[in-house]
Amino acid sequence: MAKKHVSDLDLKGKVVLERADFNVPLKDGKITNDNRIVQALPTIEYILDQGGRLVLFSHLGKVKEESDKEKLTLRPVAERLSEKLGKDVNFIPHTRGEVLEKAIAELKDGEVLLVENTRFEDLDGKKESKNDPELGKYWASLGDVFVNDAFGTAHRSHASNVGIASNLESAAGDLMEKEIKFIGGVVNNPDKPVVAILGGAKVSDKIGVIENLLNVADKVLIGGGMAYTFLKAQGYEIGKSLLEADKVDFAKDLLERAGDKIVLPVDAKVAREFSNEAQFTVVTIDQIPADQEALDIGPKTVELFEKELKGAHTVVWNGPMGVFEFENFAQGTVGVCEAIAEMKDATTIIGGGDSAAAAMMLGFEDDFSHISTGGGASLEYLEGKELPGIQSISDK
């Protein structure tokens, strides 16, 4: 069922509650990457241009004890957002109560305020994270309509997304709608042929994704640390490479079911120690020395993956091909990233997390159709799960 979009709502003079995702990295109280704030701007600017009176909600980090409050306040976000918008953002250092209610009542058309970190409510019985019905109802009572633009928390059922949406007419923001279109599109109605590239360290993190994408994709290319559990299942000796011994039988079963759909590395960069400075060699998969571990896919694998990508209409990539934080072991990830970035006629999607970080680090963010803002949310969406944050948005 299609979900309402913010443009379907009448916003002029209305108090618009919006759940944004301002969960940005901080160091010594300073924001080190404001990408999430930048990506939230189109919806915020649209609401303000339409004459909405905007009340923004977001979480920041995990709030476990009273002392976390000082370092996890949203005040730095309010300051950065104000810079980006070129207008005042009234920061309210409360999540409920008279000060907040008065500030909302005094909002004029086109003005914006930011409520303090929603997870401050977790100090008293996890009210935000457990979607306390009274809290959801209270927050909903502060506004006329609700806009959810926080895909990063769409897989969570919290008071500030599902709780508010259950009590108010609600719609998706631009960012949320883009995620539904691209990530949801891969799962529900992709333009074929579809090639999925999966990497990262653990098979266990991606079991649901692999299972679901095998139903959708024409090919699933597997790299990263997780590939070695599959290679072990094929009978290869993998030396000291990453292995999830309890997942070998699962990998074996999957390989049998998938036939030639799954494509594994044919060579690897191996080293004796886990370090960027480690001496490395490139070996074929059947030649990994017993005392060494694979830290990246090799050049022949990059070539093979490039060949498998040719002709694909939809490509979804989730997870790096090696230890891309080490420059000497980043070539596999760089090679795959470049190959996908050059596919101008295909729909190319990065499913969040480390691959998104890699693409941005390499300067390729503008070369993909879509880079997801969700980590866990993208994975659960790719698994084919219903996400409560999306489900709770009003249908058209």
UniProtKB/Swiss-Prot annotation:
Pathway the protein contributes to? Carbohydrate degradation; glycolysis; pyruvate from D-glyceraldehyde 3-phosphate: step 2/5
- InterPro entries from the entry? Phosphoglycerate_kinase, Phosphoglycerate_kinase_N, Phosphoglycerate_kinase_sf
Catalytic activity reads: (2R)-3-phosphoglycerate + ATP = (2R)-3-phospho-glyceroyl phosphate + ADP
Q: What intrachain disulfides are recorded?
A: none
Q: Which GO terms describe its molecular function?
A: ADP binding; ATP binding; phosphoglycerate kinase activity
In which residues is substrate bound? D21, F22, N23, R36, H59, L60, G61, K62, R119, R156
Q: Which GO terms describe its cellular component?
A: cytosol
- UniProt keyword ATP-binding present: yes
- What is one Gene Ontology biological process annotated in the Swiss-Prot or TrEMBL record? glycolytic process
Q: Give the enzyme's main class according to its UniProt record, as a single word.
A: transferase
Q: Which residues bind ATP?
A: K206, E325, G352, G353, D354, S355
| Keywords of this entry | ATP-binding, Cytoplasm, Glycolysis, Kinase, Nucleotide-binding, Transferase
| Subcellular localization, as worded in the UniProt entry | Cytoplasm
Presence of the UniProt keyword GTP-binding in the record: no
Q: What is its main location?
A: cytoplasm
As recorded in UniProt, its EC number(s) are: 2.7.2.3
Give one Pfam hit by family name: PGK
Family, per the entry?
Belongs to the phosphoglycerate kinase family.
Per UniProt, subunit arrangement is:
Monomer.
Protein name per the record: Phosphoglycerate kinase
List the top taxonomic levels of the source: Bacteria, Bacillati, Bacillota, Bacilli, Bacillales
